[in-house]
Every structure is written in structure tokens, then in C-alpha cells.
From Swiss-Prot:
The record marks 150 as: Transition state stabilizer. Pathway: Cofactor biosynthesis; pyridoxine 5'-phosphate biosynthesis; pyridoxine 5'-phosphate from D-erythrose 4-phosphate: step 5/5. CDD domains: PNPsynthase. This is Pyridoxine 5'-phosphate synthase. Its EC number is 2.6.99.2. It comes from Chlorobium phaeovibrioides (strain DSM 265 / 1930). Coiled coil: none annotated. Pfam families: PdxJ. GO terms for cellular component: cytosol. Catalyzes the complicated ring closure reaction between the two acyclic compounds 1-deoxy-D-xylulose-5-phosphate (DXP) and 3-amino-2-oxopropyl phosphate (1-amino-acetone-3-phosphate or AAP) to form pyridoxine 5'-phosphate (PNP) and inorganic phosphate. Homooctamer; tetramer of dimers. It catalyses: 3-amino-2-oxopropyl phosphate + 1-deoxy-D-xylulose 5-phosphate = pyridoxine 5'-phosphate + phosphate + 2 H2O + H(+). GO terms for molecular function: pyridoxine 5'-phosphate synthase activity.
Length: 235
């Protein structure tokens, strides 16, 4: 299983003082050198952490894979085509939320989604949709032309015991189904050093995206050690 590192909260820390450090690009390079196969950043409409100049700098610096998380807006579509990340991941976005709270409402926005994705796919950028682990959402993702889906693991992360086991089963079944349709499968949201291990046994999930937990750990041990510790668990 591969690891992609979300570096948004390096920018959160920097923005707390409106200064230049810590630098998200430096964090991204350290993560890459330590074994991450991709760097994830979410350019939110309110620019609360990653900002436009960060995205431009990351595009120049990242040599593995840059995954731009973004809302389905005309502004973000234009930014994606101008920036040319290897991958974009469409996520729902609410200004009042602390973090992404659920999967993209693909059925509600399907017609708009197909039109929105056309120029991005035409530019050669891969498409991922952040969705709930549900068959209907997977069917629509495939129909819309997604290359891969990121299964939302937030409910799993919030539960314990038997309830968590039920959520894990849903994720496993969704991963198997998505793979059967020819979609690549990744997972993310709320995953950490304590709850990630069971995902090693879901061979259909090729990659996990981890941000907050890893950056929090890095505050104590540094980014290289935090990345290596996570890789030791997932592999």
C-alpha cells in the first residue's frame, strides 16, 4: 500500500502568524524523500490553509504526484487546467466546516459534474472523486468518467469496536466493487497511526491519503520519521 501525504496543515501553522514558515513545499519535499508517492493539497475557496502561490510552488517542486483537492467551481476548474497537477480530487466544501465532512454528492450534481470534468480530462489530468463507500456513488463515478475513487473513511475513523468493524466491511465491499468496474481505489479521511492497520488487508485499496495525523506526529518527531513510521505500519 502506498502513502500520499496531505500538507495542508503545514500551511495552517504558517498562516497562524501570517509569516513564511513553515513552508509547505519544504514539507512536501521531505515527505517525498521519506517515501511518500504523492503530495495532496486542498485549495479551498476561502484559502484557509493552502494558497494560490503554494499550489504554484508545489507544482514546480513535486516530482512524485501532485493531487489537487478542490470544489466543483469554475474558478477551481480553471486553476486545475492552468496548474496541471497529475490528479484532481473533487470534494464537497462548506465554508463553516473544520474539515471535509462527507463524500461528494455525485447523484445530485451528476449532470454538472460531467460537463465540469470534460476540460480537465481533456487536459490530461486524472480524475478522482471523494465519495462515500456506496455502490450507487461508485456506479455514478464510473459513469462520469472518473479514473479512481477515494473512499471516505471518516465514519470508520469515528467509530470503535463492532461499529468500526461494520464500517470497515462497507469500505472493503466498496473497494472490491469499484475495482471490478475498472476504477482504481484509494482511501482517506481520519486515518491515523492507531486505525490504519486493517487497511493493509484490503488489496483493492492501492493508496491512503493522510494529513492531519501525520503532520501532528511530525510536530514531535519530524516529517521524515512521521512518514517512515506510517509506512512501517501500512507495509
Amino acid at each position: 500500500m502506498r502513502l500520499a501525504v496531505n500538507i495542508d496543515h503545514i500551511a495552517t501553522l504558517r498562516n497562524a502568524r501570517n509569516e513564511h514558515n513553515p513552508d509547505p513545499v519544504e514539507a512536501a519535499l521531505l515527505a517525498e524523500k521519506s517515501g511518500a508517492v504523492g503530495i495532496v493539497c486542498h485549495l479551498r475557496e476561502d484559502r484557509r490553509h493552502i494558497r494560490d502561490h503554494d499550489l504554484a510552488a508545489l507544482r514546480k517542486a513535486v516530482t512524485t504526484k501532485l493531487d489537487l483537492e478542490m470544489a466543483m467551481t469554475d474558478e477551481m476548474g480553471a486553476i486545475a487546467v492552468a496548474t496541471m497537477p497529475e490528479l484532481i480530487t473533487l470534494v464537497p466544501e462548506k465554508r463553516e466546516e473544520l474539515t471535509t465532512e462527507g463524500g461528494f454528492a455525485i447523484e445530485r450534481h451528476f449532470n454538472r459534474l460531467v460537463d465540469f470534468l470534460e476540460p480537465i480530462k481533456g487536459a490530461g489530468i486524472e480524475i478522482s472523486l471523494f465519495i462515500e463507500a456506496e455502490q450507487r456513488a461508485i456506479d455514478l463515478a464510473e459513469k462520469a468518467g472518473a479514473d479512481l475513487v477515494e473512499l471516505h473513511t471518516g465514519a470508520y475513523a469515528l467509530k470503535t469496536g463492532e461499529e468500526q468493524a461494520i464500517e470497515l466491511k462497507k469500505i472493503r465491499q466498496a473497494a472490491v466493487y469499484a475495482k471490478s468496474l475498472g476504477l482504481r481505489v484509494v482511501a482517506g479521511h481520519g486515518l491515523n497511526y492507531e486505525n490504519i492497520a486493517p487497511f493493509r488487508d484490503i488489496e483493492e485499496i492501492e493508496e491512503v491519503s493522510i494529513g492531519h495525523a501525520l503532520i501532528a506526529r511530525a510536530a514531535f518527531v519530524g516529517i521524515p520519521a512521521a512518514v517512515r513510521e506510517m509506512l512501517d505500519i501500512i507495509n
